[in-house]
Amino acid sequence: MQNLASQIQEKAVDSQQQLRTIMVQIAAKERALKISELAKKELEDVGEDKAVYTSLGKMFMKSDLASVRTHLDAEMASLREDIEALQKKQTYHETTASNAEQHLQKIKESIS
């Protein structure tokens, strides 16, 4: 019984640690998505005849406005997919942690 309780407790602690990591990752992805959305919004105001430059390491390279917009769209779609996958992981670990806590509570009640 003691061994089972320690395994459940380890699972709960592991899930809580994973939750914290996932929450940080979600926040970072949401921040990057917000930056991409703002960049796209700014590019909407830019005329087709204006020069657009993209970062290439420490340099900037002149790019086609359409390709920059396409790149931003692809980046935003990828970020949204990543956020969705992380949210699924978050839900899984929240459920796992909750179930582990419930099992620990039942074990404590059965011992008492």
Curated annotation (Swiss-Prot):
One of its GO terms (cellular component) is nucleus. The keyword Transcription regulation does not apply. Keywords: Chaperone. InterPro entries: PFD_beta-like, Prefoldin. GO terms for molecular function: protein folding chaperone; unfolded protein binding. GO terms for biological process: protein folding; tubulin complex assembly. The keyword Chaperone applies. Heterohexamer of two PFD-alpha type and four PFD-beta type subunits. Binds specifically to cytosolic chaperonin (c-CPN) and transfers target proteins to it. Binds to nascent polypeptide chain and promotes folding in an environment in which there are many competing pathways for nonnative proteins. This is Probable prefoldin subunit 1. Gene3D superfamilies: 1.10.287.370. Belongs to the prefoldin subunit beta family. It comes from Schizosaccharomyces pombe (strain 972 / ATCC 24843) (Fission yeast).
